[in-house]
């Protein structure tokens, strides 16, 4: 079997020179979530370790504040979960 090679990805937060990630900005957080609202790993998003940790904390805060659901039903999985 051949190993999958991932293309080189760059951290969008480092390039944007952000100071912090706001948990209320769901549009920015959706780039780090899968269609089932799971947090995507660094190798897929291209985030640095520092920003990945900050994204995880922001997503967990947004979930706690009910801005993002914890789980999604299989039947309700859509192409873009933020346009329901």
UniProtKB/Swiss-Prot annotation:
Keyword RNA-binding: yes
Reported function: Binds as a heterodimer with protein bS6 to the central domain of the 16S rRNA, where it helps stabilize the platform of the 30S subunit.
Family: Belongs to the bacterial ribosomal protein bS18 family.
tRNA-binding as UniProt keyword: no
Name of the protein: Small ribosomal subunit protein bS18
GO biological process, any: translation
SUBUNIT field: Part of the 30S ribosomal subunit. Forms a tight heterodimer with protein bS6.
One cellular-component annotation, GO: cytosolic small ribosomal subunit
Keyword field: Ribonucleoprotein, Ribosomal protein, RNA-binding, rRNA-binding
An annotated Gene Ontology molecular function: structural constituent of ribosome
Organism domain of life: Bacteria
SUPFAM superfamilies: Ribosomal protein S18
């Amino acid at each position: 079997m051949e190993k999958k090679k991932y293309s080189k990805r760059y951290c969008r937060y480092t390039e944007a020179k952000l100071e912090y990630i706001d948990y209320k900005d769901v549009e920015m957080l959706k780039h780090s979530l899968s269609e089932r609202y799971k947090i995507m790993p660094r190798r897929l998003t291209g985030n640095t370790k520092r920003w990945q940790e900050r994204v995880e904390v922001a997503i967990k805060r947004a979930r706690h504040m009910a801005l993002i659901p914890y789980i999604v039903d299989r039947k309700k999985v859509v192409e873009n979960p933020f346009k329901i």
